[in-house]
Structure formats: structure tokens, C-alpha cells
């Protein structure tokens, strides 16, 4: 396979490398308040575009079916809001005897308590071809559930989720009713559109990361915390994969994809305001914020890199299940 053909096939991975390099060279372009105004273009326009895109591409029956998939919702919410923070707390009891900065460890604990984001898990699920409708419900519900029970103003959370998730999704569904035949005939590249939006999110996320003011943190602690975060993400993704692919789990391969991403992703948009309120007045707030600031780009980067692998598994698994369900033709003697 030639280089150009390889790049065309793996354009998304190449795109990730390019946007990260661009963010490193000139982070001021994509930071909050910069020329791109990500606080508007990403928080509102890009997220709204994602869910309008989902409303256009998803059949109403798929959304209804996902809403009624109570077992999947319980799995994701219990893993995210109960298992995740509990497991992190137990892990930190071991790390507390190490020389790692105690405020970084407190930051890791807060990461475990954060709600899921409303965009990255949905885009990655769509990129793989998983149960996008279930990902939409769980991402929005998890953010609303934990966000509304925290110190962050309830009205602010509700209005933002309503305007950027619910309204675009409904509008997409309404538009779909009128252009349904055209959509089925032309088959627009919804997955590619969502992937391009994700590249925008990755770019602005890394702009914020690279432009972040210098924090009084030794390189050893920083390297260790990055290693721990990637290890935690990989371990939890593997755990959700194991739990959701058991023979008696009742989940399809597409469900598993949604579960993997929705159960392990954490929100920076809700997370930072929550930290600023809960730890207001703490001189070590910047250190407490470091794990979340690392976790957010790490989850997007890791998830994006794993898209081809997870997609390959899902397709092969779906084919295998289809073959096992086909009726056996009796052999004539």
C-alpha cells in the first residue's frame, strides 16, 4: 500500500497529528478568547452541529429504542458515577504512600467524580459505528445528573444542555422527516462530518493544554501522573469491554462501543467550574486541576487512535453473530 493510499485510509489519525502539531506551534489561535473563540464555536456551535448531525442521521425508531434500553443506561451510569470514583479512591490509598504530590492525587480523585462529556463520547461512538443513540442519551443524562447535584448552577447546566443537545437533535429529526428519501438516496458522510468536528475539538483542547500557564510541578510527578491517567483509561476501557461482551450481558457489539466511550470519558466543560467552586480559595487549585486538564485531551487522543481497532472488532463480531444466527441447511444423505 502506497503512502498516499495509506494517508487516505488513515486520514483521521493523520489529522490528529496535524492538529496537535498546529496547536503546539501556535496555541494562542485556539485558546479561549483567541481568534477562533472556542468558548462559542466549540461549546455551542460545534456541539450543536454534532447533535443536529445525529438528529439527521438517526432514525426515530433508533432513538426510541435507545431510550428504552434501561440495562445499558444503568450499566453506564453506575460505572461512571459509582465504580469509577470508588476504584480511583482505592487506587489512591496505595499511591498515598508514594512521593507523588498529594494535591495531584486529590486532583485524580476529582477526575473520578466528574460527569461524562456531551460530545467526545458521541463522536467516537459514531466514528466506530456503534450505538450512537445510546451514547447521546447517556452523555447528556450523566452530565445533567451529576452536574445538577453539584455546586454548579442548575439553571446554567440545564439551559446549556437543552440548547446544545436537545434542541439541535429535535431540529435534526424534524428536518429528517422532510428529506428522508434524499438522505437514504444520497447517504451523506455523517461520520466524516463528525470526525472533522472532533478534530476541531482536539485542536482547541490542545491549544488550551499548550497555552496553560506554567505550573510549579516537577517533571517526575508530571510524567508519573500522565502514565497513571493513560493506564487508568486503558484499564477501564478494557474492563467495560470485558463486562459488556460476556455471553449473558445482553449487549450487542454496537452497545459495547457506546459503553466503552460513555463509561470512561470525563467532562472538562463541567469539571473546571466544579473545581473552581469546590476548591475556591485553595492555593493549590492549579495542581488539583492538572489531572483533569491531562485526562480530557488524553481521552480524546486515546479514543481516536483506537477507533480503527474497535471498529474492526465490532464489524468482525457482528459478522460472526450474523453467521451463528443463520438457520443451518440440512444435508441430504
Curated annotation (Swiss-Prot):
Membrane topology: Multi-pass membrane protein
One Pfam assignment: SBF_like
Broad class of where this protein is predominantly found: membrane
Protein name (Swiss-Prot/TrEMBL): Sodium/bile acid cotransporter 7
Cytoplasmic compartment spans: 1-10, 59-71, 125-126, 173-189, 244-258, 308-333
Ion transport among keywords: yes
Gene Ontology CC terms: endoplasmic reticulum membrane; Golgi membrane; plasma membrane
General function of this protein: Involved in teeth and skeletal development. Has an essential role in the biosynthesis and trafficking of glycosaminoglycans and glycoproteins to produce a proper functioning extracellular matrix. Required for extracellular matrix mineralization. Also involved in the regulation of cellular calcium homeostasis. Does not show transport activity towards bile acids or steroid sulfates.
InterPro entries reported for this sequence: Na+/solute_symporter_sf, Put_Na-Bile_cotransptr
Family under the similarity heading: Belongs to the bile acid:sodium symporter (BASS) (TC 2.A.28) family.
UniProt keyword terms in alphabetical order: Cell membrane, Endoplasmic reticulum, Golgi apparatus, Ion transport, Membrane, Sodium, Sodium transport, Symport, Transmembrane, Transmembrane helix, Transport
